[in-house]
């Protein structure tokens, strides 16, 4: 049904429903992806719902499209719910438009998906992936035979251990067995004084000797971890602890191929295919500097070519499809290090870092000290760069401000660079922030702002018609201080006054939708305004620290190695060190330190410079901000402890929990 001719005759109920969905698909593509459709016929079509991102493979879609004519090209961008088809002639594309619009196909999971087609004038897709493996990374194909693979898999006994010769655990996203030494996930290390009895299995001996002879490895391993992954399981991005193991990390893939994601601090991501029966060897930069992990999913985006070759996945969107994962078992071999690590990457090396991470605060005094060092001081340092990334107002906040009556007095508590102070010219808005440098930026923009603590705002009680607090309360380090911040906001409101509050959510994936924080494009150097409290950070490696002494006291904190159990369960951090979060990944603790990679000169008036090249030994300064990320219902629960207030609305907005309060 062509929407341009809908006025020529009366549409049926079914046709109207289809037309609404087709128009919605057009608007969604334009709004979220910038893809503009045209009203006239062309050779090219965009196929909404027909993409790798929603489980439709090239092998499924191409035969459907070819029923309408010769397809010159089928472009399927990775992780996108649409594809582009270019036919040989316009007549063939018109036939596909009429025939396939509204057609149901079954994806690889057996679910029905309806296709919506629209014409496009130009098909362009910017390739961003590099075409080289991380330095020091090697993949050796067919390292063992299929018979040897079967023998190794059959040697693994997943029944509970009774002889304590190896340690077995069932983690949320995989099963593991340790040999030689047990890997302790609570501290991401091994106890070098307590080797497991039995050593490595005898069956591995001949393989290790062969790899040594052929020069694939230089050290004979004395520790092995067997991981078993069901389809849909994975392991978070991490770096194996420097001080725990020698340079080589060696992994043998059995049972099924897999795509492993490698990420450099500069934000470059390299997906690497590990074929069945292949050997992955990580040394040097790839072992010490790049994170590696396996995304939890049931299908991998791979090359459509017949042979699944090892190495980087092609960036050619005309040669991508989906590969269904099978049961994969990996044998990972390491050599336990007996001396401190002296690698060439001291900024990310736990042996060469000098300071220890802060502990979780156990008193109000400790919480105040933590906030001073890991919130207030950090924002003073990063104010210029932070402001350069905070320019696009969030739609729901704009909606709240524009709905207020003309002449309302509004306070923005924690106003940052003041991006909301000028949204509605009919309001009288004042802002306050703990950072002098951010307040100075507000004043440069001719906004009314002053420096103060959000727990003690020097404004008369009951004098505000409304307040907003955006991405502020999650910086307070105890529940009592977070409630006190809410009470201070309510104190400012007149009876009937409203407050809008945003905090960062622990649930960065909600209702089966990932937040923009998780989906963010690490490689794009253009527009980057995200909708959460740390979205300007593009670099996934979080353990980089500055060796610059007291000037960056917030940056000398080691990270938690995310090779521990997956999932989003909050860890008990009382009486323990605060973990450092991996940027653009799910949260594993509610109380975390989040890295900020300072780009260019931190001075406000100077331009921001790009990151240095891969392998640079002078990475950008890294600061760490304290956050308490809120679980679902936690913000509402805190609000209910405040007297004389009721919750008008609560909602989730792109990785944030939000409430609108009204003072009684």
From Swiss-Prot:
Keywords: Cytoplasm, Disease variant, Intellectual disability, Iron, Metal-binding, Methyltransferase, Multifunctional enzyme, Nucleus, RNA-binding, S-adenosyl-L-methionine, Transferase, Zinc. The keyword Cytoplasm applies. Fe cation binds at residues 238, 240, 292. One of its GO terms (molecular function) is S-adenosylmethionine-dependent methyltransferase activity. GO terms for cellular component: cytoplasm; cytosol; nucleoplasm; nucleus. Binds 1 Fe(2+) ion per subunit. SUPFAM superfamilies: Clavaminate synthase-like (SSF51197), RNA-binding domain, RBD (SSF54928), S-adenosyl-L-methionine-dependent methyltransferases (SSF53335). Interacts with TRMT112. It is linked to Intellectual developmental disorder, autosomal recessive 71: A form of intellectual disability, a disorder characterized by significantly below average general intellectual functioning associated with impairments in adaptive behavior and manifested during the developmental period. MRT71 features include impaired intellectual development, global developmental delay, mildly delayed walking, poor language, seizures in the first years of life, and behavioral abnormalities. This is tRNA (carboxymethyluridine(34)-5-O)-methyltransferase ALKBH8. It comes from Homo sapiens (Human).
């Amino acid at each position: 049904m062509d929407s341009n001719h809908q006025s020529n005759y009366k549409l049926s109920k079914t046709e109207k429903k289809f037309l609404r969905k087709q128009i919605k698909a057009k608007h969604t593509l334009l709004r979220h992806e910038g893809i503009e459709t045209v009203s006239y016929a062309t050779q090219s079509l965009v196929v909404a719902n027909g993409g790798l991102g929603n489980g439709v493979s090239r092998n499924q879609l191409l035969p459907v499209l070819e029923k309408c004519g010769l397809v010159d090209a089928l472009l399927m961008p990775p992780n996108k719910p649409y594809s582009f088809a270019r036919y040989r002639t316009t007549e063939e594309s018109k036939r596909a438009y009429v025939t396939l619009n509204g057609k149901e196909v079954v994806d690889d999971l057996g679910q029905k998906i309806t296709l919506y087609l629209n014409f496009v004038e130009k098909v362009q897709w910017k390739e961003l992936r590099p075409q080289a493996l991380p330095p020091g990374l090697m993949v050796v194909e067919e390292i063992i035979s299929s018979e040897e693979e079967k023998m190794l898999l059959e040697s693994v006994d997943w029944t509970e251990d009774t002889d304590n010769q190896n340690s077995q655990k069932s983690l949320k996203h995989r099963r593991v067995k340790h040999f030689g030494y047990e890997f302790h996930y609570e501290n991401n290390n091994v106890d070098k004084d307590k080797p497991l009895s039995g050593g490595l299995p005898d069956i591995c001996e001949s393989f290790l000797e062969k790899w040594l002879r052929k020069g694939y490895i230089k050290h004979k391993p004395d520790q092995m971890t067997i991981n078993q992954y069901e389809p849909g399981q994975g392991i978070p991005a991490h770096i194996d602890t420097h001080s725990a193991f020698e340079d080589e990390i060696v992994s043998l893939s059995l049972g099924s191929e897999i795509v492993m994601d490698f990420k450099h601090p500069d934000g470059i991501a390299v997906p690497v295919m590990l074929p069945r029966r292949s050997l992955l060897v990580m040394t040097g930069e790839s072992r010490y500097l790049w994170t590696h992990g396996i995304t939890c999913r049931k299908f991998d985006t791979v090359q459509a070519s017949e042979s699944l070759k090892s190495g980087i996945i092609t960036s050619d969107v005309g040669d991508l499809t989906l590969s269904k994962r099978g049961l994969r078992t990996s044998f990972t071999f390491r050599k336990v290090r007996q001396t401190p690590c002296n690698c060439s990457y001291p900024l990310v090396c736990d042996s060469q870092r000098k300071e220890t991470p802060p502990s979780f605060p156990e008193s109000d005094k400790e919480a105040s000290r933590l906030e001073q060092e890991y919130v207030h001081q950090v924002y003073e340092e990063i104010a210029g760069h932070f402001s350069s990334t905070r320019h696009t107002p969030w739609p729901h906040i704009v909606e709240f401000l524009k709905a207020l009556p003309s002449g309302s007095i509004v306070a923005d508590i924690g106003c940052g660079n003041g991006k909301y102070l000028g949204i509605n010219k009919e309001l009288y808005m004042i802002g306050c922030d703990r950072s002098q440098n951010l307040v100075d930026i507000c004043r440069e923009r001719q906004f009314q702002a002053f420096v103060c603590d959000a727990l003690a705002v020097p404004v008369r009680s009951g004098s505000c018609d409304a307040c907003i607090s955006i991405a502020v309360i999650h910086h307070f380090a105890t529940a009592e201080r977070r409630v006190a911040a809410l009470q201070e906001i309510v104190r400012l409101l007149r009876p009937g006054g409203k407050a809008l509050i945003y905090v960062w959510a622990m649930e960065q994936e909600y209702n089966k939708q990932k937040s923009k924080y998780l989906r963010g494009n690490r490689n794009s150097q253009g527009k980057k305004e995200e909708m959460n409290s740390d979205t300007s950070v593009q670099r996934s490696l979080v353990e980089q620290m500055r060796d610059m002494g007291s000037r960056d006291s917030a940056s000398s904190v080691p990270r938690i190695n995310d090779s521990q159990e997956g999932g989003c369960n909050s860890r008990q951090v009382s009486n323990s060190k605060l973990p450092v979060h991996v940027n653009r990944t799910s949260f594993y603790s509610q109380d975390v330190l989040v890295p900020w990679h300072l780009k260019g000169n931190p001075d406000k008036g100077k331009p921001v410079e790009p990151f240095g090249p891969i392998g640079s030994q002078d990475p950008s300064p890294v600061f760490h901000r304290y956050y308490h990320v809120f679980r679902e219902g936690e913000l509402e629960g805190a609000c209910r402890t405040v007297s004389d207030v009721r919750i008008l609305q609560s909602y989730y907005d792109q990785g944030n929990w939000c409430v609108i309060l009204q003072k009684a």
